[in-house]
């Protein structure tokens, strides 16, 4: 499968990119090179390869939540520009 110059121009238009003539040629060549490499990978015999979902055999590596001592709420809120009901008060965004 080859990508044509027109396809690169179309994708650039959709992405709102203004490519020079040189960039069009370069991007077309690079994309075709990537597709050629992907085509080579399709030809590999993977019958003896076990299917995997992850490249690294890690499982859940999260730790348990643990409450640790921290600053008192009053001390933290004392540094806030504005606080209300024990929380930081911030300007409404939406």
From Swiss-Prot:
Gene Ontology MF: a single term: ATP binding
Annotated Gene3D superfamilies: Glu-tRNAGln amidotransferase C subunit, N-terminal domain
Highest taxon in the source lineage: Bacteria
Keywords on record: ATP-binding, Ligase, Nucleotide-binding, Protein biosynthesis
Entry's Gene Ontology BP terms: glutaminyl-tRNAGln biosynthesis via transamidation; regulation of translational fidelity; translation
InterPro entries the record matches: Asp/Glu-ADT_sf_sub_c (IPR036113), GatC (IPR003837)
Known catalytic reactions: L-glutamyl-tRNA(Gln) + L-glutamine + ATP + H2O = L-glutaminyl-tRNA(Gln) + L-glutamate + ADP + phosphate + H(+); L-aspartyl-tRNA(Asn) + L-glutamine + ATP + H2O = L-asparaginyl-tRNA(Asn) + L-glutamate + ADP + phosphate + 2 H(+)
EC number: 6.3.5.-
Summary of the function given for this chain in its UniProt record: Allows the formation of correctly charged Asn-tRNA(Asn) or Gln-tRNA(Gln) through the transamidation of misacylated Asp-tRNA(Asn) or Glu-tRNA(Gln) in organisms which lack either or both of asparaginyl-tRNA or glutaminyl-tRNA synthetases. The reaction takes place in the presence of glutamine and ATP through an activated phospho-Asp-tRNA(Asn) or phospho-Glu-tRNA(Gln).
Family named by the database record: Belongs to the GatC family.
Subunit architecture: Heterotrimer of A, B and C subunits.
Protein name, per record: Aspartyl/glutamyl-tRNA(Asn/Gln) amidotransferase subunit C
Source organism of this protein record: Desulfitobacterium hafniense (strain Y51)
């Amino acid at each position: 499968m080859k990508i044509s110059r027109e396809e690169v121009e179309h994708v650039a238009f959709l992405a709102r990119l203004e490519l020079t003539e040189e960039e069009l040629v370069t991007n077309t060549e690079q994309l075709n090179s990537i597709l050629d490499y992907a085509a080579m990978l399709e030809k590999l015999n993977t019958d003896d390869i076990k299917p995997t979902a992850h490249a690294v055999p890690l499982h859940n590596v999260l730790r348990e939540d643990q409450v640790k001592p921290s600053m008192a709420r009053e001390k933290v809120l004392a540094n806030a520009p504005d606080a209300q009901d024990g929380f930081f008060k911030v300007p409404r965004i939406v």
